């Protein structure tokens, strides 16, 4: 499509439409403007067809709406001079429609998908950083935000709507992006938000308990993640062989690259592979010696913890699979930086080491504590809470993990939303063997301050749950608050 017009946009699905020019594409009738294409989908919370009159009143050029049944697919009506085209299974087609509207941006860059419960953000950031060090103009899309490296704009969801995703990709291409690393959530896969993207590679990090409030059980959660490889254009497949689900998937993906830091690879069983041979943790970070089907080498990194070794190896394997030379990757590896709010370290002379991490699942909290322990000479503190109006089943599990892996536990608030903060804390304490030893302090700023002020200079204080977030949701209010800023101020790193 040289320009955006209704006839060409819908040519694969509907004939006989006028060549009406279209300015922008939107799912939100409130922002629909003159010349726009309004798409009325039936969502989980609202039926967009109810807002067709509002969109027409605002001057839209055309409307695509969910058909009431298969028989109505392709039906064309006119309302007040505005063509309304009805398509069945519109949500499933939306990614392809938006892709055509925005001139297939995923085909105009090297786009890598990263899915899994934990490690998505760090792996995407490492991919973007590393590829940029090798000459690409790189961008990221995900939890922290969307944009070119260094120009990331914060977002609400890990994976935006199908229209948002294509729109953002088109914007990144227009800004000169040649490489993109994108977090792909299970919600995004189930809701077809990335269905029409052409991924150059797709990475699986791991699978552990999360989002069961949405998926119901682990089997459905795994099935949602598997969709990336079973129903999407996934390109090169890079899979973590240290994860039980990953090992199962590798049996169904004969061309995949198997990656391991724990030795779960038999090179004779995998055509392409990469595994750690030796890993040394120290106060400056980690030294990794590895072997692979591309050759061997050694990497020095300032990243903390075993799971970041896994993330780094997954990023390395992905770039090798995409054809980047091993020698160039080794030369640039030491310049990779930790991600904002992901095992991010704050230090000052005579003060405890403070680590801020986004860990908000049982598995992530365990991994964060194990990572911090590797670098801890004194006591290991853990300050954390659990989100309100979310999966209650993980609360006692996280309480048990904090008690087992930390020396001193401080339980506090983390986005209580509309739940009673003390009720959330009680759910966490229920998982502990000796809740009487736990320090409870509802106000998060006070809890973080108290822990850092009481910790000794050889202690490590892990503040888990919020990471990069700069807000606390109490009731329906979004209040300014940042673990990172609080820690930096207390250590005197910033005023």
Swiss-Prot record:
Q: Keywords assigned by UniProt?
A: ATP-binding, Cell cycle, Cell division, Cell shape, Cell wall biogenesis/degradation, Cytoplasm, Ligase, Magnesium, Nucleotide-binding, Peptidoglycan synthesis
Task: Name the Enzyme Commission number(s) assigned to this protein.
Answer: 6.3.2.13
The chain residues annotated with the modification N6-carboxylysine are 225
> For UDP-N-acetyl-alpha-D-muramoyl-L-alanyl-D-glutamate, which residues are the binding ones?
27, 29, 44-46, 157-159, 185, 191, 193
Gene3D superfamilies found in the cross-reference section: Mur ligase, C-terminal domain, Mur-like, catalytic domain, MurE/MurF, N-terminal domain
Q: Which EC class is the enzyme in?
A: ligase
Q: Where in the cell is it found?
A: Cytoplasm
Family membership noted in the UniProt record: Belongs to the MurCDEF family. MurE subfamily.
A GO CC term assigned to this protein in UniProt: cytoplasm
Cofactor dependency: Mg(2+)
> What modifications does the entry list under PTM / processing?
Carboxylation is probably crucial for Mg(2+) binding and, consequently, for the gamma-phosphate positioning of ATP.
Q: What does this protein do?
A: Catalyzes the addition of meso-diaminopimelic acid to the nucleotide precursor UDP-N-acetylmuramoyl-L-alanyl-D-glutamate (UMAG) in the biosynthesis of bacterial cell-wall peptidoglycan.
Q: What is its main location?
A: cytoplasm
**Which protein, by its recorded name, is this?**
UDP-N-acetylmuramoyl-L-alanyl-D-glutamate--2,6-diaminopimelate ligase
Q: Enumerate the residues binding meso-2,6-diaminopimelate.
A: 390, 414-417, 465, 469
| Originating gene | murE
Positions binding ATP in this chain are: 116-122
Pathway it belongs to? Cell wall biogenesis; peptidoglycan biosynthesis
What's the catalysed reaction? Answer: UDP-N-acetyl-alpha-D-muramoyl-L-alanyl-D-glutamate + meso-2,6-diaminopimelate + ATP = UDP-N-acetyl-alpha-D-muramoyl-L-alanyl-gamma-D-glutamyl-meso-2,6-diaminopimelate + ADP + phosphate + H(+)
Under the heading NCBIfam families, the entry gives:
murE, PRK00139.1-1, PRK00139.1-2, PRK00139.1-4
State any GO BP term from the record: regulation of cell shape
Please list the GO terms describing molecular function: ATP binding; magnesium ion binding; UDP-N-acetylmuramoylalanyl-D-glutamate-2,6-diaminopimelate ligase activity
Ranges spanned by the short sequence motif Meso-diaminopimelate recognition motif, renumbered to the chain: 414-417
């Amino acid at each position: 499509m040289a320009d955006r017009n209704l006839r060409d946009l819908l040519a694969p699905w509907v004939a006989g439409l006028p060549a009406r020019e279209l300015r922008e594409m939107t799912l939100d009738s409130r922002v629909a403007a003159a010349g726009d294409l309004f798409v009325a989908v039936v969502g989980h919370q609202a039926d967009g067809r109810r807002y067709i009159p509002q969109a027409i009143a605002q001057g839209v050029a055309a409307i695509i709406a969910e058909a009431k049944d298969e028989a109505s697919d392709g039906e064309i009506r006119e309302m007040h001079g505005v063509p309304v085209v009805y398509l069945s299974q519109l949500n499933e087609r939306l990614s392809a429609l938006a892709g055509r509207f925005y001139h297939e941006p995923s085909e105009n860059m090297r786009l890598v998908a990263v899915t899994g419960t934990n490690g998505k953000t760090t792996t995407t950031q490492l991919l973007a950083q590393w590829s940029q060090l090798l000459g690409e103009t790189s961008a990221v899309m995900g939890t922290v935000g969307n944009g070119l490296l260094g120009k990331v704009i914060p977002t609400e969801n890990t994976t935006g709507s199908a229209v948002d995703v294509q729109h953002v990709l088109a914007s990144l291409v227009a800004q000169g992006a040649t490489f993109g690393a994108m977090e792909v959530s299970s919600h995004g896969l189930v809701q077809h938000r990335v269905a029409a993207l052409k991924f150059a590679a797709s990475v699986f990090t791991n699978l552990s308990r999360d989002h069961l409030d949405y998926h119901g059980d682990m089997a459905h959660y795994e099935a949602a993640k598997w969709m990336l490889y079973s129903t999407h254009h996934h390109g090169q497949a890079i899979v973590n062989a240290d994860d039980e689900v990953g090992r199962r998937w590798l049996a169904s993906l004969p061309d995949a690259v198997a990656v391991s830091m724990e030795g779960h690879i038999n090179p004779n069983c995998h055509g392409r592979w990469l595994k750690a041979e030796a890993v040394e943790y120290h106060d400056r970070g980690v030294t990794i010696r590895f072997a692979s089907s591309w050759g061997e080498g050694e990497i020095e990194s300032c990243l903390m913890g075993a799971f970041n070794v896994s993330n780094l190896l997954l990023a390395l394997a992905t770039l090798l699979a995409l054809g980047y030379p091993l020698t160039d990757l080794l030369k640039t590896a030491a310049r990779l930086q930790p991600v904002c709010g992901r095992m991010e370290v704050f230090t000052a002379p005579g003060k405890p080491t403070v680590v801020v991490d986004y860990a908000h699942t049982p598995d992530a909290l365990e991994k964060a504590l194990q990572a911090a322990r590797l670098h801890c000479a004194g006591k290991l503190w853990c300050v954390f809470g659990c989100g309100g109006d979310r999966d209650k089943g993980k609360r006692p599990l996280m309480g048990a993990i904090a008690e087992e892996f930390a020396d001193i536990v401080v339980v506090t608030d983390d986005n209580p939303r509309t739940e009673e903060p003390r009720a959330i804390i009680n759910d966490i304490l229920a998982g502990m063997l000796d809740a009487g030893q736990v320090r409870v302090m509802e106000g998060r700023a006070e809890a973080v301050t108290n822990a850092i002020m009481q910790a000794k200079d050889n202690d490590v204080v892990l503040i888990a749950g919020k990471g990069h977030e700069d807000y606390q949701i109490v009731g329906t209010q979004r209040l300014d608050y940042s673990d990172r800023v609080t820690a930096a101020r207390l250590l005197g790193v910033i005023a």
